UniProtKB/Swiss-Prot annotation:
Catalytic activity: 7-aminomethyl-7-carbaguanine + 2 NADP(+) = 7-cyano-7-deazaguanine + 2 NADPH + 3 H(+)
GO molecular function, one term: preQ1 synthase activity
Pathway: tRNA modification; tRNA-queuosine biosynthesis
Pfam families cross-referenced by the UniProt entry: QueF
Binding-site list for substrate: 53-55, 72-73
Cell compartments where the protein resides: Cytoplasm
Protein EC: 1.7.1.13
Enzyme class, broadest EC rank: oxidoreductase
Function text: Catalyzes the NADPH-dependent reduction of 7-cyano-7-deazaguanine (preQ0) to 7-aminomethyl-7-deazaguanine (preQ1).
Name of this chain's protein: NADPH-dependent 7-cyano-7-deazaguanine reductase
First-listed, main subcellular location of the protein, grouped into a coarse class: cytoplasm
Annotated family: Belongs to the GTP cyclohydrolase I family. QueF type 1 subfamily.
Amino acid sequence: MKKEILEVFDNTYPDRNYTIEIVNPEFTSVCPKTGLPDFGTITVHYVPDRTCVELKSLKYYFLEFRNAGIFYENITNRILDDLVAAMQPRSITVTTKWKARGGITETVTASHTAQG
């Protein structure tokens, strides 16, 4: 996954706290154990500081995971780390909610709050 794909633009209202919610209901990756596809919904909530993530670049970033063998927990934390690196938000939470596999569902949430 190439985090360099992520682009940002200047936040016009950096003095105001507001929350942006981004939902990708068609996220796909591959189970590293079975090689079978995994399907999930990725939700990102963040309070921007100086920059916001550009949605087209985020879409292409998410597509990078399509053929990657990676566990749910690692996907969630990788997305969080890459978004923090790209835009340094005041706060951000990434939640991944996975379709049932063998009758079991999983939801993973990872968060970050800027220091200072």
